[in-house]
């Protein structure tokens, strides 16, 4: 069966919290996964040790297990791909648009 790296939603209404899990592709979103390899909190929070007041979203991930599952053929969903690229495991799937190069035209 095909394995997926995907998000399983927990938390409450208007306060989502996700587990990054390895599960079979055809199982339900919150069914029992094969392994939980990390968590993702999409609600921006202030860092307790940062005095600038910047907000950040919390991503905790077992990098060695994520690399293992990708190595054995687990396919990340688009959202998990984006999170793994933020951590530095995968290259970004969608690159930011580059500014257009101005073409010099001869008159």
Swiss-Prot record:
Molecular-function GO term, any one: structural constituent of ribosome
Transmembrane annotation, as ranges: none
UniProt GO BP: translation
SUPFAM superfamilies the record matches: Ribosomal protein S16
Pfam families assigned to the protein according to its UniProt record, in alphabetical order: Ribosomal_S16
UniProt keyword list: Mitochondrion, Ribonucleoprotein, Ribosomal protein
Cellular component, GO, one term: mitochondrial small ribosomal subunit
Broad class of where this protein is predominantly found: mitochondrion
Cellular localisation: Mitochondrion
InterPro entries documented for this protein: Ribosomal_bS16, Ribosomal_bS16_CS, Ribosomal_bS16_dom_sf
UniProt key word Ribonucleoprotein: yes
PANTHER family cross-referenced by the UniProt entry: 30S RIBOSOMAL PROTEIN S16, SMALL RIBOSOMAL SUBUNIT PROTEIN BS16M
Family membership: Belongs to the bacterial ribosomal protein bS16 family.
Record text on subunit structure and interactions: Component of the mitochondrial small ribosomal subunit (mt-SSU). Mature N.crassa 74S mitochondrial ribosomes consist of a small (37S) and a large (54S) subunit. The 37S small subunit contains a 16S ribosomal RNA (16S mt-rRNA) and 32 different proteins. The 54S large subunit contains a 23S rRNA (23S mt-rRNA) and 42 different proteins.
Functional description taken from the UniProt entry: Component of the mitochondrial ribosome (mitoribosome), a dedicated translation machinery responsible for the synthesis of mitochondrial genome-encoded proteins, including at least some of the essential transmembrane subunits of the mitochondrial respiratory chain. The mitoribosomes are attached to the mitochondrial inner membrane and translation products are cotranslationally integrated into the membrane.
Protein's name according to its UniProt entry: Small ribosomal subunit protein bS16m
Organism the protein comes from: Neurospora crassa (strain ATCC 24698 / 74-OR23-1A / CBS 708.71 / DSM 1257 / FGSC 987)
Lineage, highest ranks first: Eukaryota, Fungi, Dikarya, Ascomycota, Pezizomycotina
């Amino acid at each position: 069966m095909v394995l997926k790296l995907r998000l399983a939603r927990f938390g409450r209404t208007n306060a989502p919290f996700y587990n990054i899990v390895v599960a079979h592709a055809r199982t339900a979103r919150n069914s029992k996964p094969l392994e939980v390899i990390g968590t993702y909190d999409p609600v921006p929070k202030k860092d307790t040790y940062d005095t600038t007041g910047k907000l950040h979203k919390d991503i905790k991930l077992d990098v060695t297990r994520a690399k293992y599952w990708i190595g054995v053929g687990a396919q990340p969903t688009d959202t998990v791909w984006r999170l793994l690229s933020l951590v530095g495991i995968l290259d970004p799937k969608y690159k930011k648009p580059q500014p257009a190069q101005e073409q010099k035209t001869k008159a």
